């Protein structure tokens, strides 16, 4: 293990730490407590993948809430230009609507460009009535 900024780093080619790995496979109270104490809620690996990306990939609602409350940026991009919300809603999951609403409550920008269209237009293209209701509730232009 490598020590970096007082956090234990696992030796790997993308500079990912223990929290990063755990977010992908674990939903324990211990992980949530560890998250509450992270120094940088916007941590990104060498590919630009953030803790929030990982929590969204895992559809871990509680981890997402904690990260956003600590100041994680809901509009952060990885190096490919993908924001965390697409990691969640890009795959069918029962938590998608809740995740979308939480992200919007914390400043997710529906006008943000994702793959040549706004996030709002992309979400509407899914033709999911519940998601579209959530978008309508938060979209003010």
Predicted feature locations:
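Ankyrin-repeat boundary/"N-cap" motif
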Residues: 12-21, 44-51, 77-89, 113-121
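N-terminal segments that cap or nucleate solenoid repeat domains
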Residues: 2-54
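Ankyrin-repeat intra-repeat helix-capping/turn positions
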Residues: 26-27, 59, 92-95, 127
């Amino acid at each position: 293990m490598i020590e970096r900024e007082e956090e234990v780093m696992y030796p790997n080619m993308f500079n990912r730490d223990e929290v990063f790995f755990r977010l992908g496979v674990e939903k324990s109270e211990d992980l949530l407590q560890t998250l509450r104490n992270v120094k940088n809620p916007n941590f990104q690996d060498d590919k630009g993948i953030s803790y929030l990306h990982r929590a969204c990939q895992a559809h871990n609602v509680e981890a997402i809430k904690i990260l956003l409350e600590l100041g994680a940026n809901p509009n952060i991009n990885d190096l490919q230009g993908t924001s965390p919300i697409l990691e969640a809603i890009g795959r069918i999951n029962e938590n998608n609507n809740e995740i979308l609403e939480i992200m919007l409550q914390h400043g997710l920008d529906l006008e943000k460009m994702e793959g040549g269209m706004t996030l709002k237009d992309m979400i509407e293209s899914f033709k999911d009535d519940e998601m579209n209701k959530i978008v309508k509730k938060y979209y003010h232009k």
